[in-house]
Structures are given as C-alpha cells and as structure tokens.
Amino acid sequence: MARKLAAGNWKMNGVEADLAEVDALGEAVAAANCDVLLCPPATLIAPMAKRAGLMDLYVGGQTCHTAASGAHTGDVSAAMLADAGASHVILGHSERRADHGERSEDVAAQVTAAIDANLIAIICVGETEAERDANVTLNVVSSQLAGSIPTGATPAQIVVAYEPVWAIGTGRTPTLEQIAEVHDHIRSELAARRGSAANDIPLLYGGSVKPGNAAEIFAVSNVDGALVGGASLKASDFGGIIAALSAA
C-alpha cells in the first residue's frame, strides 16, 4: 500500500520572507494523515529545512545533476541537496524536459544520482496537448516510464507523478475518468516490471490541483496524492489540499 503524499513545487518562486508560509502550515501538517513535502528553489532548501525540523514536514529539490561534483556551472548535485536538508527531489518535470531539453535517459541518470545520495526521486511523466489530441497519451506515458526509471530503483526510492503538460498552470484539468485511466495504466506498467511491489510506489497527480477540486481527484483510483504547483505557495491553499488528502 503506497503512502499518501502531498508535494508542493514552488518552482522559481520565493525568497526568505516567503518562508512565513511554511510556519503557517504548522497546524495543517500536525493534523495531516499523509506525508507533506515542499520543494522550494535551491536557495531556500536549507532555511526551509530548519523550519521543517520543527514539524513533520519534508523538504526537497526541483532537479539535480547526474554527476556528484565537477565543472558544471550553475548546477546542483543530489549530494548538495541532501547536505542542505532535502529528502526528495523532483526529476523529469515537463518544464525541465521542455526548457532544458532533458530526455528520459537523462532523467534516469538523475534518478540514479538521487538514489546514490539517499534522496527519494519524484519522477514526472505526462503528455502534451497535441499528444492527448492524437490519442497517444498511454504510449507516451509508457515510454517515459520505461526510459526514466532505472532498473535498480526500488519502490521505496521512487514516486511517480502524472502531470498532463496541458493542465499545468492553465486552470484546466483532465476529467476524473482521464486521470483514472492514466493512473491505472501507470500502476499496471509498474506492476509488469516490479510485480506486487509496485503497489508501494506512490502515484501523484499534478496539474491545476486546488482546494476546490482536490477531494474529487483524491477519490480517483490509484491517486495517492498530488504534486501541487501554484497552490502550494500559500499555506491556506496547500493546507486545504493536505486536509483533502488526509480525509481521502
């Protein structure tokens, strides 16, 4: 049985003053019947981790390099994330795939680096609007899963997040039936490779999750939580999503 996880991705948002939102999450985190994770920009991981240490809150990174160290100006290694206090890292997010040309094989190498640094890798998969319209969503997701998850990764070391690219930050969400179809497919694909152990891998939905639609999304089969973007920036919004997942 997979653990429920509410994960917030701050993306390129936030300065130290915004950590007041973390303090404001304290009550929601204390009452949560799920794991709660925030992934801020790299500059905020260490100060956020200090606050998180006072509550049952995990902190993560948003990407990592495949190398442990070296001449890679501007990059951050998985070991650096861990040293700053991170326990998780988001990998293969559609914005990284699009903006930085990261391919599934690159993501797999990043996952290996993350695991070597004792980080849990949140591996993102999902289709573009054109791929959805062409009815190749499941093929795309299968290909990304096969290419992005290294063979040696164990269920305890990974989380999979389904994020339809066309729903991220747009206010649009797939129908509940569409979410169920993809999440059931992901579970089936993982089971084909990992057997019954695949049931221990949390499957998150990401794409315009808000307090108002969270409960119905969390009622969908094989949805174990959410990867939340904009709504994770405000404690009032993210707290509502945490409460909805706790009640699911």
Curated annotation (Swiss-Prot):
PROSITE patterns: TIM_1 (PS00171), TIM_2 (PS51440). One of its GO terms (molecular function) is triose-phosphate isomerase activity. InterPro entries: Aldolase_TIM, TIM_sf, TrioseP_Isoase_bac/euk, Triosephosphate_isomerase, Triosephosphate_isomerase_AS. Pfam families: TIM. Pathway: Carbohydrate biosynthesis; gluconeogenesis; Carbohydrate degradation; glycolysis; D-glyceraldehyde 3-phosphate from glycerone phosphate: step 1/1. One of its GO terms (cellular component) is cytosol. It catalyses: D-glyceraldehyde 3-phosphate = dihydroxyacetone phosphate. The keyword Transmembrane does not apply. One of its GO terms (biological process) is gluconeogenesis. Its main location: cytoplasm. The keyword Nucleotide-binding does not apply. The active site is at H93, E163. It is found in: Cytoplasm. Substrate binds at N9, W10, K11, G169, S208, G229, G230. Its EC number is 5.3.1.1. Keywords: Cytoplasm, Gluconeogenesis, Glycolysis, Isomerase. Belongs to the triosephosphate isomerase family. Involved in the gluconeogenesis. Catalyzes stereospecifically the conversion of dihydroxyacetone phosphate (DHAP) to D-glyceraldehyde-3-phosphate (G3P). Homodimer. This is Triosephosphate isomerase.
